[in-house]
Structures are given as C-alpha cells and as structure tokens.
Amino acid sequence: MKDLSSAEIRQMFLDFFASKGHEVVPSKNLIPQDDPTLLWINSGVATLKKYFDGTVVPNNPRITNSQKAIRTNDIENVGKTARHHTLFEMMGNFSIGDYFKEQAIPWAWELLTSPEWYGLDAEKLYVTVYPKDQEARKIWEEKTSLPDGHIYEVEDNFWDIGEGPSGPDSEIFFDRGSSFQDLPDDDPEMYPGGENERYLEIWNLVFSQFNHLPGLTDNSQYPELPHKNIDTGMGLERVVSVFQNGRTNFDTDLFLPIIRATEKLSNQFTYDDSQDSEVNTSFKVIADHIRAITFAIGDGALPSNEGRGYVIRRLLRRAVLHGQKLGIKGQFLTNLVPIVGDIMESYYPEVKANTAKIQKTVAAEEKRFNATLTGGLSLLNDVIKEAKKTGQTQISGADAFKLSDTYGFPLELTQEQAEDAGLTVDVDRYNDELQAQRVRARAARSNTKSMGVQNAVLTDLRVDSKYVGWSQTEVNHAEIVAIIGEDEQGVDALLDNADVDATVQVAFDVTPFYAEMGGQVPDFGDVLNTNGDVIAHVTDVQTAPNGQHIHTVDVISSFTLGDKVDLKVDMARHIAVSKNHTATHMLDQSLRNVLGGDVHQAGSLVEPEYLRFDFNNEGPVSSEDLDKIESMMNQEIAKNLPVTWLETDIESAKKLGAVAVFGEKYGDQVRVVSIGDFNKEFDGGTHANSTAELGLFKIVSESGIGAGVRRIEAVTGLQALSQYKAQEKALKEIATALKAQKLTDAPEKVYDLQADLRTVQRHAESLEAKLANATAGEIFNDVKTVNGHTYITAQLQVSGMDGLRQVADNWKENYPSDVLVLATVADEKVSLIVAAAPDANQSGIKAGELIKSIAPHIGGGGGGRPDMAQAGGKKPAGIPDAFAAVSAFLADK
C-alpha cells in the first residue's frame, strides 16, 4: 500500500476528478450562507444544494470538492469510538444531470485501484448494492476488476430523506484484515456492511434517479427523475486511517500531532493507541474538539449561549474538562490551535493565518469557563448543603440542569462533586429537562427563520400586507389579516383568535415593522388596542414566501382576526439599528476607497449594539489602512451628510452610480440609498437621517473568516465612546501597575520587565539542573536487588514531572540500576515516573507495564513506552505502597 499523507490523499482525489472534467470547488465556510435550515455545513453536498434543487445552474455540471463539515448530534460518542468526529472532511464528486452510474462506478474503481492514483489492492475491496439495482451490480461486474464474490446486496442501500430526489447507492468497503476483526467469523454482522471493525466503509456512491413524491411510501412507485444526479462521499479521516494503518481515525497525521502536544501539556499521561481507556478517550476528545473549535472560530463563529456559539462553547468546555482529567491545569487549548493550523495548512492556509485571532478567542473563553467552574462550585455546594439538611440522598435533575444550562456547570462535574458528598444525581430527570430544551430549540429554529421552506400555511397565505417603515414607525388602525398558530392537534394553522400567553404569528394589512433582511435585524415593538393598551409584544419579523411581513408576537391580551390595532416600533432599537446600517454603507465605501474598487461585500450583520461587515480581500488589512478607514468614516460623519432614498427602475439606478451588493438578486424596481455624494447603494433597509447622527465610529476587530474573506466588527455613537473609554482605562491601569509616570512610558517598562523575566528564567533553569545533578548523586547509591534485578526508588522534592525527567536523564547516562522509580508531590497531586534500562527491557521488564501495576496505589493511572512511563494520582500517602509494589513486580520477572 502507498505511504500517503492526508494532504496527498485529499489532493489526489481532487486531481483525479479534475482530470475527468470536474470543476474543483474550494471548501466553503462552515457557516451556511442563505440557508437558515442548517446550523452548520454538515455534509459535502450541503454547499451544493442550490445546484441540486435547480435554484442555480452550475457553470460546469461536474463538480468535486473536499468540504469541511461539523456535526454534533453524537458528541457523546467522540473519543469512545474509532470514527466519531465533530469536525470532518467529506471528499466527493458530483454530477448535476450529466454523467451517471456508467461512468461514476468505473471512475471510483480507477481512483481506488490504479497505480497512478491510490493503488489499493483490489482483493481487499468489497461493495454493496441495493438488491433492485441490478444495473449497478452489472456495471461493477463488467466494468471493473472487482473479484468474484465481493458484491453484497443490502436492503438499506437506498438513499431517501423524504420528499424529493432519492435513489439506490453503492458503498465501498476496505478489508483491513484479521488483525482488525472484532467478531467471530460466524457472527451475522461479520460482512462488508455489517457492524464490525474489519470491513471499513470508505466511499458511498449515491445514484439520485427517483423523485419521492408526496404520499408515496414504496420506493418502487417513485417516478424517475428527468435529470439524474450523482452524489458521492468519501470521509477523509476514514480513508487516511486505511493508508496509515491507524487502529482508529485518531491514529493518523490528522490527529496524532495534537495528541502528542497534549501529552506534553499533561506531563502525566501518554496516549496508547493499542487499547481503549479513559485516558485515551480524553486525548481523542481534546484532539477532535480543538479542530472543530479552531475551524469554527476561524470561519467567524464565536462562543455564546445559543446557536453555533453554544456549540463552540460546549466543545471547548468538554475539552477543558478532559484536560483536567489528564492533569492539565490552567489554560491549554490555545497552545493546540497552531498545531491544527500546521496540520491543515496545505488546503486551509487561512487557519494558520488566523491563528492569533483564534487563540485570543479560545483563551478568553477558557478563562471565562475557569471562572464558571469556580462560581458553579459555590452554587453546587449550596445545593448539596440543602440536600443534606433536608435528608435527601439525591440532587434533583432540575437543579443539575439549572447548573448546566444557566451557569454552564457541566453535569459530569456535578456528579463528581455529588459523589464526594455521598449523594447521587437524578440523571433521568436531567435528561428529561435536556430533551425538553432541545425540543424548544428545534421549534425556535423552524418557526420563522425557515418559513419559506417549512411552513405550508405561510406558503399558501395570500393576504395583502404593506410595509411603510421607511417613512413612519407608528401605524394606527392597522387590521389583523392573519393569525397563525398551533391548532388543537398541534399543527400550524390559520386561527380566528389569539389567546393570552400564546406565541403566534400575525400579519397586518399595513406595518411599520422592518422584517429581517439583507443582514439587518428586525424591528421589535408593541401591538396596542384602540384603548391604547398593549396587547402583544413583537419579538421577531420575517418575510413570508409571498412577501408579507410576518410578526411573531407574545400575546398579553387576546385578540381576534379583523381587529383594528395600533402598531408602535421600539424606537431605541430602531434608531440604533438604523445608525449602524448607515455606518455599514459608509464602511463599504471607505473600504473601496482605501483598499481599491475590487473590494465587495460578502455579508453583513446590523445589530443595535454593533455592526459586522464581511468583504473580499487577500490577507489582513494593515493597521495603517484600518486607521485610514476609521479616519475617513469619522470625517464623513462630521460633515453631517444627508441620507436620502428613492425608488426607481434598476437601469436608472445603475446610471446614478448605485452599487449593487455582490451576489444579491434584484427585481425591476429598486430602492437606492444615498449618503450625500459619498455613497450610493441598492438597499431596502432603514437608515439614519444624516451621518452626524452616528456621532462616532470605531473599528473593534478585523479578522479572516475564510480564504480571501475578511471581517470587520465596529461600533458607533455611545458604544464607540465606551470602547475608547475602556481602552483608556486599561492603559491607565497598565501604566499604574508598571509604575510608569506617563502612558507613553508604559511600553519601555514592559520591555524592561520582559528582559528581567528572561534573566530569572535562565537562572531558574540553571538551578533546576544543578539540583537534579545533586539529587541524582545521592539516590543512585541506594540500589536494591530482588530476583537478580536491581532497582532504585526515591521520593524527591523537585518541580513536578519535568524535575523527575531531569533526574531520569542523569540516570540514563550510566544506568546504575535496571529500573528507576521516582515520585514527587505538588499540591496534593502525585507525579510518578518509571525508567527501565535496555538490558531490563531485554529480560522482559517494561516500564509501561510496571507503572500500570503500581499507579493504583497513588490513586491514579498511567502508561508509556517500554523504556519510560509516567503516571499521576491524587493519593500521596500511597507512595510507599507503590514503591513496595516495585519489588513484588520484579520478583515475578
């Protein structure tokens, strides 16, 4: 088998299909663009959906990619199985109505077996087909050199996810050999396609040839599609494990550098790929999660309490907890980010380029979580005290969930602390609470953000609704023309009434509420009855498939279809959003003025508190250019330029010099917003009346979110002033701490401190080395003998595992004994190291085996190589017993 790196395997896949006329599409951002139904890009085909559903016709119907993706539905299995990941890459080739099985199957075989490409042994390849897909079976038999008996018919080989395209598929398996076999030969699962470790699925070819129409349940009744498609997926991590003979996906060049770096950070435990253990699980979880965290933050997602941000936060917290299990103290994940960048640099250079920004975000979140752990422990202690006071033996699931959901305190830690206090946790009730939250989250994601796709009631809604928010923020005597909510069966339906405390969707014949669009968040506000009483709060506004503004409202007082109501927009929010939207247009223009006319918008978000603007640019924007952009913005703000708008036809708008947002689609009539003579753009949002209303503009950050795409986050008005004040305060505090007379003296003080620190560090290292040499001279004379084997045991006062290693290195210079066992204690934690001489190894004494037999005495575990192993524990009193166990171990050798 060829010796290929992960980078070579990926590139070879893309090169092969490029040679077959495919367009190589770069891996897209993990954050879906214009697809609110997805939290993350979760498959190789997800970014190509617009081609498969016919929304967009590709320039080339043949496409290939290697797409990064995130899935977290099985997060609990990560590290416990061989192939579960949160971040993974899916390589694929796709045909949009072009070639079909006759070419897809032979090409797959050529890539896998040709010496020019992967060169896998044909005898080790097996395929499965759908029993009714004899066409595919015949192609495998006649158009490839697949050995006889290597085709299995499997009923599950039919890809069908509901209404729409569907079809049979062929899965390709690689026989890893008897050393990977985990089931008896006669086990019903011991075949390609069964649940076993020997036959590994490496590629799935989906033949999308049928149309699953509504009401049909038997796939034999599905009509054929007029244009058939090919959709294949090869998991990079899986196929790399084949070429690199990894026992799991983690035992490859995609993960091992991260694991090795984590071993060094642990200083107590080592990863042993020959077995499954809790220690190995922790190494794997950390390696998996830091990859996902690094890529997600690099693509623009940030830790938060909801949506994508919550996924990042959860992954990071799980990784931190597993780091603690490995004895890692303090912040450590930030040290692993550059390693991810190095591993993936060949295909994702932007990750390495954004390392500093990603590290900063990770470090801040780690610090926040460490504070959470401290605060959570205090709250948990109160819960434990109350439970004991009332004679309970269990912490309620509701309390455990509250600690987790509200305060971010993980269930695992709650269980650990409860056990120490002699209590248990009601995990079943906790899971009930968690499931209820997931149901709420799914409902929230599906109600309005994806209404154009999911809600048939809205699709059929034909009532008229006029938006007047460009010129007014209040409307009197608006009529309620539609109420949408759950009927008695829990199904969305048109209702006649809205009851108190319900959350429903409402359409009015005329509305001042802006619907979320073009990156601008929606207006909030109130619905009032004719007496002026608030009867509902508007909490969201979206555009329905037929253009109506659909208002999500929390009902305070019941109302009825046809009622006349007054509508009032929350002015504070509206004004803040409008100012930031105007700033977004000005920033767009300033970027083009400073960086060049080739710069175009790649996305935006306009919130009340801040604005975010994405744009194309190769490489980071220099600090000098950022200063120019910021200065230009504030100069134009100071000019008090008027902000005006007009509606006209698209050709007239272009003649006026209005700029269209790249990638947006426009109708015949467009709205043009002008900011004096500074900027003209097509736009449908709300704006300030003049630039002076913005007050001040401040760039908060500039970063990369993908290949060739940069992001600026900025604030205006009082938010900008607060930024300046916060920076000034921080500088003053730094100057005070440094005892600098003036702020301008602070940098020189920092340089002096750095020089002093380097001097102290060198001195400390010198003292450590001298201490190790002195200690070694004392203990190497105390040699004991048992069963003809010599050994030394000693408890030392050195600086943790590094100090023990220093002494062990001195011991290796002349091997005064067959075995060396050293221990030290710091903060009630034991570090233990075992070294075995080459002669001892030859006589069957392995350091890794010895440490596993003695580590339980110190309340811990460990492992390592035959010549060197280490362990950690929480029981210093057990050190004498551990040393005594050395003699017993050697007596049996």
Swiss-Prot record:
GO terms for cellular component: cytosol. GO terms for biological process: alanyl-tRNA aminoacylation. It is an enzyme of class 6 (ligase). InterPro entries: aa-tRNA-synth_II/BPL/LPL, Ala-tRNA-lgiase_IIc, Ala-tRNA-ligase_IIc_anticod-bd, Ala-tRNA-synth_IIc_core, Ala-tRNA-synth_IIc_N, Ala-tRNA_ligase, Ala_tRNA_ligase_euk/bac, DHHA1_dom. The keyword ATP-binding applies. Belongs to the class-II aminoacyl-tRNA synthetase family. Catalyzes the attachment of alanine to tRNA(Ala) in a two-step reaction: alanine is first activated by ATP to form Ala-AMP and then transferred to the acceptor end of tRNA(Ala). Also edits incorrectly charged Ser-tRNA(Ala) and Gly-tRNA(Ala) via its editing domain. This is Alanine--tRNA ligase. It comes from Leuconostoc mesenteroides subsp. mesenteroides (strain ATCC 8293 / DSM 20343 / BCRC 11652 / CCM 1803 / JCM 6124 / NCDO 523 / NBRC 100496 / NCIMB 8023 / NCTC 12954 / NRRL B-1118 / 37Y).
